[in-house]
Amino acid sequence: MTTPTAIRRLDAADPDFARHLDHLLSWESVSDDSVNQRVLDIIKAVRERGDAALVELTQKFDGLQVASMAELILPRERLELALTRITPVQRQALEKAAERVRSYHEKQKQDSWSYTEADGTVLGQKVTPLDRAGLYVPGGKASYPSSVLMNAIPAKVAGVTEVVMVVPTPRGEINELVLAAACIAGVDRVFTIGGAQAVAALAYGTESVPKVDKVVGPGNIYVATAKRHVFGQVGIDMIAGPSEILVVCDGQTDPDWIAMDLFSQAEHDEDAQAILVSPDAEFLDKVAASITRLLPTMARAAIVETSINGRGALIKVADMAQAIEVANRIAPEHLELSVADPEAWLPHIRHAGAIFMGRHTSEALGDYCAGPNHVLPTSGTARFSSPLGVYDFQKRSSIIYCSPEGASELGKTASVLARGESLSGHARSAEYRITDLDWKTGNLEEGK
């Protein structure tokens, strides 16, 4: 006999619901002191000793016997070789996914713009891609080629000149799918290094690893902590927490589908969060039964069970309107609207990393091949953050080109404001360009 699931049950009608929900959502992402200090030591070593430190740390943490950085560099030919080592079906899937991701992100490209005022002054914005981006990819058997596509393709679409990938190969384990994905995505350089030391190398540069402008990509607590510390020296994408899925269902979807959708995120790790919200209490019972029945069939059953029982929940609400309220409160990474008319509810969704609309749109499709990016804000940060995209690899510069007439008119306003702030250098710089002698006589002699 299968033991019933121990997943948490909440009811929005409970007077303590808000408190219980806050407790469910709480997750501490801050590194402990020992991790923090180890990361600081690693960053210091890489900054001071460059390649030598990378070689030593790779030997220590990845169990590799390497004598120099030359052994930790993969040439383009090795990426092309990986394409021949995966199956034709795998290559076709990677290429199709890459094509869809590229097509979607092409639509995110921003163009420079400008306009001319009546006096000839030109104002505008110049959009420029980053020179170099660094992509961190977890290594070993738990590698994710889809992450390579999702991080590298937007950078290349943005026009980044060089994409540098770092991927650890613990005990010499190389994932051919990851290298094949790097080849398809157009990654320019690959180093087989990982951990905090790889992040430090990308941020500060070494004799072999070029310094980048931005570091993106997922990693463990050491990688995340290193990204926190190098932020400011370089840009970063985000500090990602555990994966999350929130399913809002009207009770009409197959319970097995919903259970498996919850599993799709719960299988990532024990801290992942999978939540179902529905106004149908009987449907929640059916999904709970599906969870119990399907759990033993999962390859990562132990991880799924820990996640579901520890951080998962089935939440009963009064109606669909309240379900949407709860969804906005949670601000999930992935939100499935498994309802009859998702378009009707879409305008009411304010906070979600990605929104999967309709019963047939499983979150897994977004993870791999739908097209939108799967690098999404977690831990409620969808309230103020967005998915990774082309815009993360472009920067904007303001353009101001004053005509003599424009400089004269703007100078009057600038002079008054600058003198109001007691910044006479600013004021005089603007005033030198004012051609209206009457204005100068009437204002500057009065010390204004």
From Swiss-Prot:
Binding residues for substrate: 243, 265, 268, 334, 367, 421, 426
Cofactors: Zn(2+)
Binding site for NAD(+): 136, 197, 220
Catalysed reactions, semicolon-separated: L-histidinol + 2 NAD(+) + H2O = L-histidine + 2 NADH + 3 H(+)
Cofactor notes: Binds 1 zinc ion per subunit.
GO biological process: L-histidine biosynthetic process
GO molecular function: histidinol dehydrogenase activity; NAD binding; zinc ion binding
Pfam family name, one: Histidinol_dh
Keyword Zinc: yes
UniProt protein name: Histidinol dehydrogenase
